[in-house]
Amino acid sequence: RTILKDVHEDFGWDFLPDLPLAKFPPYYRKGRNKDGFGVIWESSEDGEYGLPVVKPLADWSAYGTFTWPDFPVQPPQYRLYSGHMVGKDPRWYARGGWITFFETMQELRGFEDVLADIAMGEDSAFALRDDMLAFNLALVDKFLALEYDGIHFADDWGTQTSLMISPELWRSFFKPCYKAMFEKVRSAGLDVHFHSDGYIMDIIPDLIELGASVINCQSNCMGNLEVGRRFKGKVCFRTDLDRQNIMTFGKPAVVKEHIDSLFRALG
């Protein structure tokens, strides 16, 4: 608390009060709770990110009656996980959104079913993708109506050692969608932020090509030095620390050296 009086978090999160428990979204509430898409989330404790256990499009025949929600986008009053200040202010960088694409498809249809649909070239895969894109483009417009410096997109694409799908399939099926979303943001004069956990080395060149200004990734599992060798100076990295080993077991001096090494490798 003392340091926050002198050094504010760069997105201004500490200017917002914590979200009251009664206002937690469905995926952060204990028990089973339904979100605006009709996905039912299950969590064992309040504040613990839950799992989607009932997916409205697990049976594709339900798609004919599925209704896409119309979410309002308003300046946030509270913070939870990642707060987003609105408005130009020297005290913070105003970054809006946490807009997912592949992850929302999984929550609606199911992880295995989405991948199987794509692999087999099912009409359902293209229908869900195209409608998901239309939904997200409309959502981006709502964020662009507010005063932000950048818009944040997020999809976890990596496992510990590789992409979840082949880079070629990612480029043919998903890349055009990211292109459309990123172009809308960039043409409005805003920065594009993209979050993706896991090993995503294969698509970092694509994200840079598409205009991502900031990539929030886990460079440790890809090799910090190799990520820096290939991409240092081409994009801003907002990288994760080594939570699996150093941040869990390392002594203070080891942690300090780890952080310094990240700046040397990627900064």
List the model feature ranges, each with a label.
Residues 26-75, 87-92:
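A contiguous, low-structure linker/loop signature
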Residues 2-22, 142-148:
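Catalytic domains of carbohydrate-active enzymes, especially glycoside hydrolases
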Residues 13, 30, 35-39, 226-231, ...:
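Glycine/serine-rich loop-strand microenvironments at binding/catalytic pocket rims
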Residues 5, 9, 17, 32-34, ...:
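Intrinsic-disorder/low-complexity regions
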Residues 1, 43, 65-267:
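Active-site loop segments of alpha/beta catalytic cores
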Residues 19-30, 70, 97-102:
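Short, glycine/charge-rich beta-strand/loop segments that flank catalytic centers
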